[in-house]
């Protein structure tokens, strides 16, 4: 469990690092923490001894990362933890709980069995670790306490633990959330761990071992699971902000001893006659309105004098009042448990010892339920790695190696580390008979190289160079490629060539140079290659092109083409489906032969194809084509054409759009200018535009009358004693009423569908 709420305080200061950050270091591991973590996996079917399997592979991972683990075993549990252990045993071994509860006649020794069952599990783990050559140490009490002690005195570089109690025991560097898996919430590629360094945390926030002990007393820990009721993390942190690390424990002890002092502080904090902002005599409300004479202010007062101090004192008084409700607070046994240390520093040999393959197969194989050949496959690389690391030391001592490298097979790269794959041999026959013949025969059926593959391992290149330099050097030399021979001849010195002219001439006469044979390459024929333009022009003209029998008949027909061509082109008259090769030479000749020739065909189906340039002005042409007004709109226009003409008169449209919709020029060409009234009488005023849009007919022009004096324009233009403006308005209103009546008639219609 550890100290409650401690991880939430320290987690913001943790660093997530890969496990290779621990390379070359010694780390103390709380073995009980790993075992409990494995035993709590009950959500799905797992290995019957999952804790042993998990311990083996985790330890192997640390060995591959060149980390030296030191496992710390549990000692005698403190009496303060007896209640917590009893509750854990009930939860862990509830399936084998005795039927009858313990009676008062039972002795205390029989009831308080301690960790008998758990110690048996730890003993199995110790046997596994000793066979792997890993050191196990047993502390006098809690494992995390002894691991913190080793870290505090520099025997190990850190502690791997999930229990926050190790901080209360004085651990300096703690590794939490150790993970070698690539799945789950704590997954990381290649393994990762959270690093908590108390030296950095203390320098940032003045938070050390003593404050952690106070937090354990107030919030709760393994020795007082409930803590003090009503006190949480926020209240404790406010207390830590007020006092330093070195004085926090003494302040906590004085809560019960200095009663008079805290009673006086409580009276001062609650006194209404003292301002809560500045602490001077006077109510807070009066100081806010009239000011404070001591602070020398006319309005308000100095809040920095008393307000923050009053709040911190009040928070401490609240914590004190709640804590003193517990008669044993502060519990000196808990404080001494966290601060006590072994009297002497042990002289421990924490190095990696030689693994014992035979012991692992004989004692641990049946616990893990692994066959002998599988145990050999998993354990043999551990033995070879230890031998590679300790090769220099063992050679100096003169110890005989169990296995020897035969040769290097190939280069390998493991997680970015240059490595080599080796083949080993057992010269002394130490491992003969460990694997049954039946398992060997089954292995040989699946692996073509046979039992030899069991002796293949992969080791780092730098370790092999230090352990077996001759073997590595010979392998690397065999892999070196010979230098390439220079194929390019060196240039001769011109001076030497001049000096040896006679010899050079003699060599040339003796070995005359053979003339080079020039081979003409034939071009591969291309299928239906497209000829160039010059090839078209070089061909025969019209006489050379194939002509159909129907050509004389077509020649008698009049030409109906607006292109200025003076003669027929036979290739144009042929069908597109003819099998004759497509030839455009006659087309090109027809275009370039006489470009100034006049067309002979000028009309087609009654329409003129070629027009002569207008010598006169366009306005003169319009005047010649102007007709009488009674001939306007003789033929009804299609709705689309009428709509286009209306749009050509809209001013808000751009000029390019109006010009594209205007069909005046087309009508001019056809001679139908009489159908466009706005070309005869252009629109000049908004009134003319309104007349045109609503198709308002005009009266015949009246004979010219001399304008009367003082008469308006519209009255002067009147006819039949009516004003022209009034006639215009009446006609427009009449059109609107007629449109409304048409809409009403359409609404009265009922359409019956099929």
Swiss-Prot record:
Mg(2+) 1 binds at residues 30, 74, 142, 144. Keywords: DNA damage, DNA repair, Endonuclease, Exonuclease, Hydrolase, Magnesium, Metal-binding, Nuclease, Nucleus. GO terms for molecular function: 5'-3' DNA exonuclease activity; 5'-flap endonuclease activity; DNA endonuclease activity; double-stranded DNA 3'-5' DNA exonuclease activity; four-way junction DNA binding; metal ion binding; single-stranded DNA 3'-5' DNA exonuclease activity. One of its GO terms (biological process) is DNA repair. Mg(2+) 2 binds at residues 163, 165, 222. It comes from the Eukaryota. The keyword Hydrolase applies. Residues 514-523 have a biased composition (Basic residues). Its main location: nucleus. Its EC number is 3.1.-.-. InterPro entries: 5-3_exonuclease_C_sf, GEN_chromo, HhH2, PIN-like_dom_sf, XPG-I_dom, XPG/Rad2, XPG_DNA_repair_N. Binds 2 magnesium ions per subunit. They probably participate in the reaction catalyzed by the enzyme. May bind an additional third magnesium ion after substrate binding. Residues 1-90 are annotated as: N-domain. One of its GO terms (cellular component) is nucleus. Residues 738-754 have a biased composition (Acidic residues). Belongs to the XPG/RAD2 endonuclease family. GEN subfamily. Endonuclease which cleaves flap structures at the junction between single-stranded DNA and double-stranded DNA. Specific for 5'-overhanging flap structures in which the 5'-upstream of the flap is completely double-stranded. Prefers the blocked-flap structures similar to those occurring at replication forks, in which the 5' single-strand overhang of the flap is double-stranded. Also possesses weak 5'- to 3'-exonuclease activity on nicked but not gapped double-stranded DNA. Does not cleave bubble-like or Holliday junction substrates. This is Flap endonuclease GEN. It comes from Drosophila pseudoobscura pseudoobscura (Fruit fly). The lineage of its organism: Eukaryota, Metazoa, Ecdysozoa, Arthropoda, Hexapoda.
């Amino acid at each position: 469990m550890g100290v409650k709420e401690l991880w939430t305080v320290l987690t913001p200061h943790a660093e997530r690092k890969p496990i290779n950050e621990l390379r070359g270091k010694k780390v103390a591991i709380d073995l009980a923490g790993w075992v409990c973590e494995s035993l709590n996996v009950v959500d799905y079917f797992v290995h019957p001894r999952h804790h042993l399997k998990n311990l083996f592979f985790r330890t192997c991972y640390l060995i591959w990362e060149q980390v030296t683990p030191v496992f710390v075993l549990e000692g005698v549990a403190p009496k303060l933890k007896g209640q917590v252990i009893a509750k854990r045993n009930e939860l862990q071994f509830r399936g084998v709980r005795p039927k009858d509860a313990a009676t008062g006649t039972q002795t205390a020794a029989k009831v308080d069995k301690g960790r008998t069952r758990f110690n048996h599990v730890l003993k199995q783990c110790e046997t596994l670790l000793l066979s792997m050559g890993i050191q196990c140490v047993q502390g006098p009490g809690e494992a995390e306490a002894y691991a913190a002690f080793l870290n505090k005195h520099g025997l190990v570089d850190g502690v791997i633990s999930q229990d926050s109690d190790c901080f209360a025991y004085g651990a300096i560097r703690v590794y939490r959330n150790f993970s070698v898996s690539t799945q789950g919430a704590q997954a990381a590629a290649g393994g990762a761990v959270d690093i908590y360094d108390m030296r950095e945390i203390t320098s940032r926030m003045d938070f050390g071992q003593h404050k952690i002990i106070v937090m354990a007393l107030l919030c709760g820990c393994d020795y007082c699971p409930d803590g003090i009721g009503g006190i949480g993390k926020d209240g404790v942190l406010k207390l830590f902000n007020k006092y330093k690390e070195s004085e926090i424990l003494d302040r906590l002890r004085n809560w019960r001893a200095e009663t008079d002092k805290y009673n006086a502080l409580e009276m001062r904090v609650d006194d209404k006659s003292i301002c809560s902002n500045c602490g001077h005599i006077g109510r807070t409300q009066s100081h806010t309105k009239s000011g404070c004479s001591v602070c020398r202010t006319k309005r308000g007062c100095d809040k920095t004098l008393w307000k923050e101090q009053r709040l911190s004192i009040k928070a401490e008084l609240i914590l004190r009042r709640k804590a003193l409700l517990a008669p044993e607070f502060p519990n000196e046994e808990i404080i001494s448990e966290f601060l006590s240390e072994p009297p002497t520093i042990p002289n421990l040999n924490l190095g990696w010892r030689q693994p014992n393959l035979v012991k692992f197969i004989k004692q641990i194989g049946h616990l893990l339920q692994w066959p002998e050949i599988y145990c050999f496959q998993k354990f043999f690389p551990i033995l070879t790695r230890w031998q590679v690391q300790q090769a220099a030391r063992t050679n100096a001592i003169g110890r005989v190696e169990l296995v020897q490298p035969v040769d290097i097979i190939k280069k390998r790269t493991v997680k970015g580390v240059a490595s080599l794959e080796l083949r080993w041999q057992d010269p002394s026959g130490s491992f003969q008979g460990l694997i049954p013949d039946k398992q060997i025969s089954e292995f040989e059926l699946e692996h073509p190289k046979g039992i030899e593959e069991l002796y293949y391992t992969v080791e780092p290149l730098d370790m092999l160079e230090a352990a077996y330099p001759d073997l590595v050097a010979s392998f690397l030399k065999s892999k070196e490629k010979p230098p390439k021979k220079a194929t390019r001849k060196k240039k001769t010195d011109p001076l030497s060539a001049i000096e040896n002219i006679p010899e050079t001439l003699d060599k040339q006469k003796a070995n005359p140079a053979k003339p080079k044979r020039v081979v003409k390459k034939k071009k591969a024929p291309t299928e239906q290659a497209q000829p160039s333009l010059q090839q078209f022009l070089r061909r025969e003209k019209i006489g050379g092109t194939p002509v159909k029998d129907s050509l004389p008949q077509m020649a008698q027909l009049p030409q109906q083409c607006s292109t200025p061509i003076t003669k027929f082109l036979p290739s144009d008259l042929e069908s597109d489906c003819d099998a004759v090769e497509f030839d455009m030479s006659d087309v090109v000749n027809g275009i370039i032969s006489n470009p100034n020739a006049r067309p002979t065909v000028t009309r087609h189906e009654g329409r003129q194809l070629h027009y002569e340039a207008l010598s006169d002005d366009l306005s003169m042409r319009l005047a010649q084509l102007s007709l009488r007004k009674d001939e306007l709109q003789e033929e009804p226009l299609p709705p689309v054409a009428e709509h286009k003409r209306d749009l050509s008169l809209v001013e808000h449209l751009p000029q390019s759009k109006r010009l594209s919709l205007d069909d005046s020029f087309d009508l001019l060409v056809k001679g139908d200018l009489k159908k466009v009234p706005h070309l005869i009488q252009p629109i000049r005023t908004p009134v003319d535009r309104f007349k045109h849009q609503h198709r308002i007919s005009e009266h015949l022009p009246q004979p010219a009358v001399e304008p009367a004096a003082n008469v308006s324009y519209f009255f002067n233009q009147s006819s039949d004693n009516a004003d022209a403006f009034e006639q215009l308005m009446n006609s427009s209103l009449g059109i609107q009423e007629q449109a409304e009546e048409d809409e009403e008639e359409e609404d009265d219609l009922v359409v019956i569908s099929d």
